[in-house]
Amino acid sequence: MTLSPPKILLIIFSILIVVVSQSVAQDTEVSFSYNRDLRSDEVYDSKNYLTGDWGGIRGKLNNLGITPIAKYYTTILGNPVGGKKKGVQYAGLLNAYLKFDLEKLLSIKRSKFIVSGSWATGRSLSDEDIGNFFTASEVFSGRSVRLYQLFFESELLENFLRVAVGRMGIADEFSTSEIFYNYVSTAIDAHPISLAINDAAYFSDPQASWAARIHVTPTEKFYIKAGVYNSNPAVGRDSAHGVDFSFRKGVIVISEIGYLHNQKQFSKGLRGRYTFGAFYDTRKFDELASESEKQDGNYGLYWIVEQMIYREMTEDDQGLTPWAALTISPDESINTFPFFISGGFIYKGLVPNRNYDKAAFGFAYGTISDDIKDKDYELMLELTYIIQATPWLQIQPDVQWIVHPGGSSDIPNALVLGMQLVVDI
């Protein structure tokens, strides 16, 4: 018997509901979201910000339940070897958030309201000079000022259930990991790039769409979450500035199940996280071999594994953590990358007396659909080092080697050199 994609997802949802219904709620330390700038469990400390406490104003706002957050990301990258032509490009992204603690403000227990915006500048080295799929800088997000997030989130039943509704990016919560944010290339940061290449409505920072999601934590080690997101790539265009509030085209239905262990601080065991997810998009997709032909629906699967294998004795989170991610989007008639795999490792505290620095290696490899002629695969290798210069400043020199840019040997393999700066304003 052949199962259609919707039936496959229905079976997955049914299994998850049964598991949840037979479980008992317990406390957990999982944060609200993997969004790099928003952490519900983060404790306010003015020393972590470039602008400090604003003469006491920032601390007073935080006590009232209003937390302003702003981070600036910038990359300066060049390709001295290979690509379409040699070049150097700058990209910048300013993200600004207001987080309202509704329990403090309105006595609505365990609830928050988030509104955020972004200002994206610069140019893409990959688009302008290299010609590859796996764009070298995740910071480049077009050139636009836009509204980003606008959503309400609430914890229920002592954190057994979290519910969110509003404007959100799908990859802020699904198919992502904190470990991905240690990289510069979009191939890895902030989620496997194949998902967004195959489905242009698979939004991440700073793009968002109307959505609703739930997150259930039946045990300390297990979670399941599901969401419905508007599937309309046009909503994310630069000229809309994030205020195209229409709901058209279709929806992405997504679910993710995860197993976590040794997540608590000072846990004796080594931390690990294992994730599986599946999604189905109901809108119409252009066929790759003929743009005049369209197909109803698209679906994909993903797996993410990260497991610490060595921990230093001095600090809880210093040590070596390998990771891997895999995505499969079986329909080659509409998916540019039907198969994609990435992986690598992070070592925190590798250099003596640099306990907060991180060294990272990563790779990403994707096979290209047979329906796209004269293209077969693209490979990216990245070596990077994050220098935690101050509590509010990261300096990150970065090296990338891009093989088969654009999926063929027509463009010479490219060497990318440069750095990323992150300022917590």
Regions found by a protein language model. Give the residues of each.
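Outer-membrane beta-barrel architecture
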Residues: 56-58, 97-99, 151-153, 213, ...
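Detector for outer-membrane/organellar transmembrane beta-barrel domains
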Residues: 262, 267-286, 291-370, 383
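Transmembrane beta-strand segments of Gram-negative outer membrane beta-barrel proteins
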Residues: 28-44, 58-81, 113-115, 123, ...
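Outer-membrane beta-barrel "beta-signal"
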Residues: 413-425
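Short loop/turn motifs that connect adjacent beta-strands in outer-membrane beta-barrel proteins
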Residues: 26-28, 45, 52-68, 101-113, ...
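Transmembrane beta-barrel strands of outer-membrane/channel proteins
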Residues: 70-76, 113-119, 163-167, 224-230, ...
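Outer membrane beta-barrel
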Residues: 87-233, 335-371
